[in-house]
A protein has these predicted regions:
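Short, conserved catalytic or adaptor-binding loops enriched in Gly and charged residues
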Residues: 81-87, 182-184
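Short acidic-hydrophobic, aromatic-tinged amphipathic segments that line or gate anion-handling sites
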Residues: 85-101
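Pre-Walker A adenine-sensing motif
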Residues: 7-27, 48-51
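Conserved P-loop NTPase motor cores
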Residues: 33-53, 67-69, 96-184
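Intrinsically disordered, low-structural-confidence terminal and linker regions
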Residues: 1-2
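AAA+/P-loop NTPase substrate/partner-engagement loops
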Residues: 57-78, 83
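Pre-Walker A (Motif I) flank of P-loop NTPase domains
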Residues: 27-33
Length: 184
């Protein structure tokens, strides 16, 4: 009986990935992050280190949707970088609310850019979408409408973002139990 070759063959056209200059344990781009912790536990500092240190200069664009982007002084270093990235009056990168239409346009534009880059045999640019502190906006996580196929653009981001060279970071505050809750 003839033995079949069971090795895996990698075909041309495999997904493009870009290594993080810091190496392990930082994943290659595109990637995604999900972090949930109580308030005051350093989530914003982790976010700033991811965007401004570990992946510094690797994103052609970074969009952030965060109610406190203009209020929280911790975000100043990120705001400074985003303001230098492009003219905010023509191409805003900072939003205080998540608008499914804006997210959809970002994803659709990036898909078109990636398609054109692949036709021209060019490397597609990596971009990043940051979603922070949106838990109190009830429609954000519950929405099932807005995406191209009838689903949420957040679902499109989570399921197909990597194919469009989109990395994404979702940060949320975890509710801390009150003392009476923990006493049982």
């Amino acid at each position: 009986m003839e033995r079949k070759d069971r090795s895996i063959h990698v075909y041309d056209g495999a997904a493009e990935t870009f290594p993080c200059p810091y190496g392990e344990p930082m994943p290659d781009l595109p990637t995604n992050w999900l972090l949930s912790a109580p308030s005051g536990q350093g989530k914003t500092q982790i976010l700033l280190n991811i965007a401004l240190k570990f992946y510094k200069g690797m994103f052609a664009r970074i969009w952030i949707f965060c109610p406190s982007i203009f209020l929280d002084p911790q975000y100043k270093p990120l705001r400074d970088v985003l303001e230098k990235m492009c003219d905010q009056t023509k191409e805003p990168l900072m939003f205080e609310e998540l608008d499914q239409g804006v997210l959809g346009k970002i994803l659709d534009d990036q898909r078109k850019i990636v398609e054109e880059c692949r036709k021209r045999k060019m490397k597609a640019p990596n971009v990043c979408i940051i979603l922070d502190d949106l838990g109190d906006q009830g429609d954000v996580l519950a929405s099932r409408r807005g995406g191209k196929s009838g689903g949420s653009w957040l679902t499109t981001l989570a399921c197909r973002g990597r194919h469009m060279q989109v990395s994404w970071i979702l940060f949320g505050a975890e509710a801390q139990p009150s003392r009476s809750d923990s006493e049982g």
